[in-house]
Amino acid sequence: MARYIGPKTKISRKFGELIYGKTNKSFEKKKYPPGNSSSRNIKKTFYSTQLLEKQKIKYTYGILERQFLKMFYKASKKKGIKGEILLQLCESRLDNIVYRLNLSHSRPEARQLVSHRHITVNGKIVNIPSFNLKPGDKISLKEKHKHKANKNKLLGSDWLSWDNEKMIGIFKYIPNRNQITENINEKLIVELYSK
């Protein structure tokens, strides 16, 4: 699967919830899945629910299959609950932190900000969206783009902080499962990959 650049509403309708973070009028009108009406009556198997959950997390964070598989293997090598560690790895990506700090309106926009070299981590420019942050890292926009920063509420709660005077965000600690707001059942993903 290559990077998806098609209609975002179709993806949101497929899962029955907003995936890309923005509210969408066309999603509000048609909350049923896209496609033929006869295809909606087919009974879902357990495998299909597992697959949909995996696709949901990949679309939510903008990750392709190979990179997601590497993240799963990395999570399975660490001590703890695999699914929770997998979500923590997704949440600690630079593009996601830029979105959570409210420096962008969506994750694809955050990804573009990072790849266009507008974001600095600890004073150094980083242009890799999948860059994993460590607790204590400081994230900010480059000097000439600091006026564009949204001074609104953070989308991540306790584990991020934003200083309006210095225009610097701090990744305080890795969030636990209760602090991750995404509606993802990580147990189904672990079961799918553990076959």
From Swiss-Prot:
Domain S4 RNA-binding positions: 92-152
The protein, known as: Small ribosomal subunit protein uS4
Xref: InterPro entries: Ribosomal_uS4 (IPR022801), Ribosomal_uS4_bac-type (IPR005709), Ribosomal_uS4_N (IPR001912), S4_RNA-bd (IPR002942), S4_RNA-bd_sf (IPR036986)
Function in brief: One of the primary rRNA binding proteins, it binds directly to 16S rRNA where it nucleates assembly of the body of the 30S subunit.
Keyword Iron-sulfur on entry: no
GO molecular function: rRNA binding; structural constituent of ribosome
Originating species: Karelsulcia muelleri (strain GWSS)
Gene: rpsD
GO cellular component: small ribosomal subunit
Statement: the UniProt record of this protein carries the keyword Ribosomal protein: yes
Protein family (similarity comment): Belongs to the universal ribosomal protein uS4 family.
Keywords annotated in UniProt: Ribonucleoprotein, Ribosomal protein, RNA-binding, rRNA-binding
